[in-house]
């Protein structure tokens, strides 16, 4: 899986918004400055998040962006889907929708298993956990394994 800049920036912006203990809106300019996100790109990302119901915009001099849901109720998977679509796609389609001939049908099981593994992590990590820097044990256990930090190429060496 490739994590796009769009998903990474969206999560970084949401971490900044969720860290505001007073719930005050944060301007796009401030979000961009704090996380070094290009302004135009950030505006498009925030629009995607607004359409998905994750954030709301507040107009006016003290306006900006706020979460539209509790940060505990917004998962990493929700954010990725809001800005990039399905967690796993094959030729732009969900894996279960791809038709294979008999010899290659086994690939569908691989793609669906991969999506299931991604869901195990992405659906169980909330924006609140990211903002607080407190990841669930399922994530910290996986990252405690030294092999988790190695790319496939490095492990084969």
Whereabouts are the PLM-identified features?
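Short amphipathic alpha-helical interface segments
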Residues: 10-22
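The C-terminal cap of the DNA-recognition helix in HTH/winged-HTH DNA-binding domains
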Residues: 19-22, 33, 51
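A short alpha-helical element within helix-turn-helix/winged-helix DNA-binding domains
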Residues: 26-36
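Short coil turns linking two alpha-helices in DNA-binding domains
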Residues: 38-41
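Basic amphipathic alpha-helical segments that dock to polyanions
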Residues: 45-52
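Beta-hairpin "wing" of winged helix-turn-helix
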Residues: 53-68
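Conserved segment of winged-helix/HTH DNA-binding domains
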Residues: 71-96, 108, 112-115
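C-terminal regulatory/oligomerization modules of transcriptional regulators
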Residues: 95-157
